A protein has these predicted regions:
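Non-heme Fe(II)/2-oxoglutarate
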Residues: 1-83
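Catalytic core of non-heme Fe(II) oxygenases with the double-stranded beta-helix
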Residues: 69-179
Length: 179
């Protein structure tokens, strides 16, 4: 069973993050994809160094700091700075892939081994159709579509994908943890 963490940010924090990222300019999501995953990645992403990304990231990190479930579920030694993605329109899916085993922060050049992948849903499930996170693990395929503010943790070595979004926008924060 994959750890599901309910209500990671407060309602106010979630509202603030959505206000920040909704007003931002999004880029092609391939900016952070590895060579192989770039072939199946089709979404939008906030540039890591933009003001909006930095502001939203600080709110997410503060929420993680307060979450006992996150600490016990991920055992974080290092957290790769949270990123933000958006699936809608023609940039609406991410095919089967495995996350890179090591991520390098382009701003600090620090390396993070990716033991645990984290997806924090920022859109309510009724705001979009499709967009399910499908994770293949030893127990089969698990389909995840959580309320805004909820987060799922899963092994970074798992094959996973985001199903096409056919209506609305699926917005999330995603990041990796070195345990």
């Amino acid at each position: 069973m994959l750890p599901h963490l309910p209500s990671v940010p407060t309602a106010d924090e979630l509202h603030r993050v959505r206000g920040i990222v909704d007003a931002a300019r999004w880029s092609d999501g391939k900016i952070t994809a590895g060579t192989q995953s770039a072939q199946v990645k089709n979404n939008r992403q906030l540039p890591q160094d933009c003001r909006e990304s930095r502001e939203a990231r600080e709110i997410v990190l503060a929420a993680l700091d307060r979450s006992a479930l996150f600490v016990t579920g991920a055992l974080p030694h290092r957290i790769f700075p949270p990123l933000f993605n958006r699936y809608e329109g023609s940039a609406n899916a991410f095919g089967n892939h495995v996350d890179n085993s090591v991520r390098t922060d382009p701003l600090t050049r620090e390396h993070t081994r990716t033991d645990v992948s984290c997806t924090l849903f920022l859109s309510a499930p009724e705001d979009y159709d499709g967009g399910e996170l499908v994770i293949e693990d030893t127990f089969g395929c698990q389909t995840v579509k959580l309320p805004a503010g909820d987060m799922i943790l899963y092994p970074s070595s798992s094959v996973h994908r985001v199903e096409p979004v056919t209506r609305g926008a699926r917005i999330a924060s995603f990041f990796w943890v070195q345990s």
